[in-house]
Regions:
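Ligand-binding pockets and gating/stacking loops
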Residues: 1-163
Length: 163
């Protein structure tokens, strides 16, 4: 960030816990907790947090019910209805929670949030116009929209957590 790099993506695998979920998650959750804490602290101390957006999420949550069948041994399958994500810095207020699930985390109860809402909010706060055209990575001579019209039409905003 200090060198003007506009975008960094980090892929940290090992979260697909269909088997032995709680045992499997001990290591990556501890590592992620320490890494995100250090990143946010460092960005804040260097005066970069206000101009840097940090987004941490997966593409879905995990089913509320733990599968105790022998072949899964405490696993949890994919679950798109409820999930957790984190955004920080770059125009987002800290310490906020948006949305709420029911008591069993089987359905949303208040203010459903979608991945498209995160995308729309991040693009807006980063000053990216979704109608701009960027080189298509498959055919570098052709240009395509930053966001397809189908995705753009579904993008809400998380304005309740904007600074």
């Amino acid at each position: 960030m200090e060198y003007g790099i506009p975008y960094i993506s980090i892929n940290y695998s090992g979260w697909d816990s269909h088997k032995r979920h709680f045992e499997t998650m001990k290591r990556p959750t501890a590592e992620m907790d320490m890494a995100v804490s250090a990143l946010l602290t460092d960005l804040n101390e260097r005066g970069l947090l206000d101009t840097t957006i940090v987004w941490l999420s997966g593409e879905f949550g995990r089913v509320p019910k733990v599968d105790r069948q022998p072949q899964w041994n405490g696993g949890r399958n994919h679950f798109p209805r409820c999930f957790s994500a984190l955004v920080a810095g770059g125009g987002f207020k800290g310490g906020q929670v948006v949305g709420k699930s029911d008591e069993t985390t089987d359905h949303w109860k208040e203010r459903p949030v979608t991945p498209q809402d995160f995308l729309g909010s991040i693009m807006e706060l980063a000053g990216v116009d979704p109608d701009d055209r960027l080189p298509n990575p498959k055919w570098l001579k052709e240009y395509g929209p930053v966001m397809s019209p189908a995705v753009k039409s579904q993008c809400g905003r998380l304005k309740e957590i904007y600074v």
